[in-house]
């Protein structure tokens, strides 16, 4: 598939000059003139990804940008340190177009490195810190990086895996003594050596790649999604629509107060920095969202004055539990996504967010986030009963910049015929594959043409559409309902049963904590249930489902159902099938 036409071909040179706390040139805050985009996308900010953040060093250099425990970094300090790291990387051979593997937990260092890499025109290859050693090695093989910037644990790979050991530049994020022992350069030394340096001037366009992020791999091998500067600018604009800062400021309810954000999503923290607000990094233990201390997080939220909170359901649940019986008075907006958000969490939101807080459910994927959103109040009022009746999870209406189609499910690549994209679409009310296009929808994968063929469709206008792999339908109010992954659909007889719809139905039973619908080898439907000890009654479960018209051939019980390592909330169907599909 040919690359999509560029919507901004004009090269320009980064004009930010930062020495100490010097501000960027005012001229970098221009917007694009309203030139029509050949793909139909609206104009976005002309600023490149790093400029979106560094512009704030000019107008609010003393404002706190990042808070990590007892450490606070201002926008001026952030710009100063980014310039030093960017100069150090460039001085050690990292050039425009190179790739830099970045394996750093959520911390100030993560954002310093990501933005420094962007500033020199290189591409950061973000690898989840909880990745296994083989997954890290695989990412290096795919990316063929010029540099490897990582925590000490990951540097052990340089001796164990040839591909990792061959990376020309190794930078260790941690103690300088460990760096010397590992034969690496310490990130701290890069900063010290180039303290006070000006930000390198590198020509680049908005279409240049700036970030590679891997899909979760829950439905196959992880794919490296390419994000350009334009993509990140559009995604930042979409996230700002969720957070809704403008209407909040216009309302005058908190005059003069700027938001303080806390998010367990790395990309949302980056967006907070683009917005020029304070981002408080959540205090997580080594286990990440598996190790959330809800009471400790509530204390930090109160002490730091957090007003916007976001994370997966697994991250938010302990916070909500700890806040019951009291209110998170300063929190005005909570956004949850990354995995299905239970109806019960939407119902619990009022108890902790009154009097002014609002809870928003966001639906998206690595390739397109956000796609659709719905307020918890609308879930409670309009859609919860249907979810409990097995009709799926309502994720709301599409983002204003998202174009959405529901395509007839297909097992392989799709080709556009004379009728265009609409010729592949299902009829109103039917279940189809959620397929999207827009300025914050990924258009390609790095070095993976097979994945591009399988998940991308180019229509008659040249627009690239992304097939999410999710099955869903639209209701009469234009809301999107998700019923499960197409690949995980269970065919029983002449009828399809969609996992998310059936699982939500089962989870309405008292004591049923989680459920997974899988096909067994005999062609039947098997429900694997994680339930409290006193609730492990297979007859009760099958009768409940049968009453809703869902026949299940067998019920199996598991102590805990496996979930994705990233958000700790999305079911790992592949592992469940391997263990329970006998």
What spans do the regions from the language model cover?
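Conserved pre-ATP/AMP-binding loop-to-beta segment of ANL
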Residues: 61-62, 185, 191-214, 221, ...
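Conserved C-terminal "lid"/linker of ANL adenylate-forming enzymes
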Residues: 490, 516-517, 542-582
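Conserved ATP-binding/catalytic segment of the ANL
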Residues: 47, 103, 422-499, 508
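Conserved AMP-binding/adenylate-forming core of the ANL superfamily
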Residues: 45, 54, 62-107, 111, ...
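Conserved AMP-binding A3 loop
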Residues: 74-76, 203, 208-237, 278
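Conserved AMP-binding/adenylation subdomain of ANL enzymes
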Residues: 122-123, 234-307, 322
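Gly/Ser/Thr-rich phosphate-binding loop
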Residues: 173, 186-189, 277, 307-310, ...
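Structural core segment of the AMP-binding/adenylate-forming
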Residues: 21, 92, 120-190, 531-539, ...
